Amino acid sequence: MSLIPRIFGDRRSSSMFDPFSIDVFDPFRELGFPGTNSGETSAFANTRIDWKETPEAHVFKADLPGLKLEEVKVEVEEDRVLQISGERNMEKEDKNDKWQRVERSSGKFMRRFRLPENAKMDQVKASMENGVLTVTVPKEEMKKPDVKSIEISG
């Protein structure tokens, strides 16, 4: 097995006996049973969120493609807890439709973050643009210690 990507594509077969196969074997996939993919909602339920600290604020970014503003909720709780949650509903099914493959995830997600003491919980701001949620939590300015010069006698 090579760790270097192949230049002319992957010649590996999609065999159920190949542990490194790209397409995982699912015996029910071709039979048309809905919801056989156990990870159907896991991709959405395990929404990844980046947390970056700048000198001025704590900034959280979450990729939430396809979600509308009203499907996302940002809340602050006591004890400096920031909660980001949302829900993507399944597409309504027409009884005449036959799904060939369902790869887009649906379901709920919720992530909670305990913020440090310097977080200004009353000034949290959130915005969503092009499917990316950005939550900004300003930080209190660090009080600089008073420095007193001492005269050196000689």
Curated annotation (Swiss-Prot):
Its main location: cytoplasm. The keyword Methyltransferase does not apply. InterPro entries: A-crystallin/Hsp20_dom (IPR002068), HSP20-like_chaperone (IPR008978), Small_HSP (IPR031107). The keyword Cytoplasm applies. Keywords: Cytoplasm, Stress response. Coiled coil: none annotated. Residues 40-154 form the sHSP domain. GO terms for cellular component: cytoplasm. Pfam families: HSP20. It is found in: Cytoplasm. Induction: By heat stress. Forms oligomeric structures. PANTHER family: HEAT-SHOCK PROTEIN 20 FAMILY MEMBER. Belongs to the small heat shock protein (HSP20) family. This is 17.7 kDa class I heat shock protein. It comes from Solanum peruvianum (Peruvian tomato).
